[in-house]
Amino acid sequence: MAIKTYKPYTPSRRFMSVLDSKDITAKSSVKGLLTKLKATAGRNNNGRITSRHKERGAKKLYRIIDFKRNKYNIEGKVAAIEYDPYRNARIALVVYPDGDKRYILQPSGLKVGDSVIAAEGGLDIKVGFAMKLKNIPIGTVVHNIEMHPGAGGQLARSAGMSAQIMGRENKYTILRMPSSEMRYILSECMASVGVVGNEDFINVSIGKAGRNRHRGIRPQTRGSAMNPVDHPHGGGEGKTGTSGHPVSPWGTPAKGYKTRKKKASDKLIISRKKHK
C-alpha cells in the first residue's frame, strides 16, 4: 500500500504522510454492525484522570468485528474492504449465503470477491481461512489468535502483525509472537491464516499535532518542564538534567524496568521477547 506525501507548503505538511486509500471499496458501513462507545477520555467513574494524555477525539462509531469466527463450515464472500476508525487495520465485510453479514480483520492479500470459511476441522491453508491451531501446519503465519477456546481472537490483531506456528507439544501449540516471545497456546484455540493487512501503517508520519488530537491523544508535558511538586524531574534554575535514572511521575524507573506482575500463565511462556 502506497504512502502519500505532501508538498511542504506549511511547516507541518513537510513531514506529514497518509496512507493511500485506494484499497477501500465501501461507500458506507452496514448499519446493523455499528454501535456507539462511551468516550471516557481517560477518566474513571469518579471523573478522575486514571490514564493521562487522552481525550475524546473525533466522533466515530464502533464496528462490531467477528473475532470468534464461529460461523463454521459456511463459505462467505468478501463484499467490501472498509476503513475502521477504531483500529489501524482494514476490515472486510463478509456476506454469507443465508444473508448474514460480518466484519473480519482484513489479512494481507484478501480482496473483494474472495471466499473465506471457518471450521473446527481442517481446511486448505488460504488467506482469511480460520481453524483450530491443531489443524494448521507448522511454519504457517497466523493472526487473530485466541488465548482461550471460544473466547475470540486476542493476539496479533494490529496492522502488519502475525505469529508463526513453531511446533506442538501435548495439548499445546508453540507460537512465536510478533515480539519474538515464544509461548504455548492451547491447540483447541482458533486462529486465522495470514498476516493482518495495512502493513505500511507503521511508516506513516503524523506530521502535526492536530492529527493526534483527532485520534484522541493529548499533548505530553516533559517532567523536567514541571515543578518539583508535580514530578521528580521538576524544578531547578533554567534547564537542568535529571539526577539519577529517569522515572515516572510516581517514581517508577522509566527505562527498562520490569513492572509485569507474576501470573499463573507465566509457565506458558517459553522465552521472553528479544530486545533489538
Curated annotation (Swiss-Prot):
Keywords associated with the record: Ribonucleoprotein, Ribosomal protein, RNA-binding, rRNA-binding
Biological-process GO terms, alphabetical: cytoplasmic translation
Full protein name: Large ribosomal subunit protein uL2
SUPFAM superfamilies recorded: Nucleic acid-binding proteins, Translation proteins SH3-like domain
Subunit structure: Part of the 50S ribosomal subunit. Forms a bridge to the 30S subunit in the 70S ribosome.
Start-end of Basic residues biased regions: 257-276
One annotated GO molecular function: rRNA binding
Annotated spans, Disordered: 212-276
A GO CC term attached to the entry: large ribosomal subunit
Function, as annotated: One of the primary rRNA binding proteins. Required for association of the 30S and 50S subunits to form the 70S ribosome, for tRNA binding and peptide bond formation. It has been suggested to have peptidyltransferase activity; this is somewhat controversial. Makes several contacts with the 16S rRNA in the 70S ribosome.
